[in-house]
Amino acid sequence: MSSKIMEYTKDLSIVISLYNEEESLSELVNWIEQVMIREGYNYEVLMVDDGSTDGSWSLVKKLSEKNSAIRGISFRRNYGKSAALYHGFAAAEGRVVVTMDADLQDSPDEIPEMYRMVVEEGWDIVSGWKKKRFDNKFTKNIPSKLYNATARWITGIKLHDMNCGLKAYRNDVVKNIEVYGEMHRYIPYLAKNAGFGRITEKAVQHQKRKYGVSKFGLERFVNGFLDLISLWFLSRFGKKPMHFFGFTGILMFLTGAVLTMWVIIEKLIQQAQGLLFRPVTDQPLFYLALVAVILGFQLFLAGFICEMVSRNSSERNNYKIREEF
């Protein structure tokens, strides 16, 4: 997303990614509306339907007829939360952009204080921290603590709950980052890499799930760790892959060359001393050296190819939208 100066037509944009949340939508919208009226905000609610197969999208359209602040985007199929946030961020017109989940586990009552922290205290991002959780201890709470500890160590961002869906951003933060793949978990890290380093957190009330079942499982946490490693690598070497592949390749190549020279010199010394010696091709060290040289050359070539790809990649998200209003 490109940076551009814009006039904010709203105080708040609330971006909600939803997938098969028909049961909770009416209650959530009513709750948000009560808070917005009480605080006197000029607001909009951007509901992004990520390919729901229930009646979620039809309900969003009905709710928008009663409340003109509701806007909707519907994908043709399920692309994931990152895709929903990407389009929600692009459409957001509010001075402050708030993200929250549609399952009623995030409380709209937290929004006013988070808004104040962004506007009055000047934070780029205020991230929610579910200090007291109502999730299964073994399948979600413990993996979550392990995941967040690792995320803090790798990213250097001291957040207790990196993956909390309830967050508040300055508008120019979301306009200057690209959320893709499964990187919605690491928006604070994306923002930090884009130059938005004023990041803090606020303890928020976590609600018990009222309808349906959680769509998060142990597999999502494993994927989260893999995504974190990918993001760390891309943030360090994404624009300069030759620095990683080239350096590693040269190191391997030189190691192989040194081992090869050692085998040859050893043979020459034994010859000069009239000692019996095995043919070079009978020595395991020779093949180890050969493998190192070949791997080094291939890694260097991979770095060159990645460098060319990174220089010519458009890095655009391309998702098919069925309907938008």
How should each PLM-predicted stretch be described?
Residues 1-34, 41:
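N-proximal low-complexity "stem/linker" segments adjacent to membrane-targeting elements
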Residues 2-9, 188-325:
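Hydrophobic helical membrane-anchoring modules
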Residues 21-24, 52, 81, 107, ...:
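Donor nucleotide-sugar binding loop of glycosyltransferases
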Residues 29, 33, 41-52, 73-74:
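Short beta-strand/loop segment that forms part of the nucleotide-sugar
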Residues 49-58, 104-105:
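A conserved acidic beta->alpha catalytic loop
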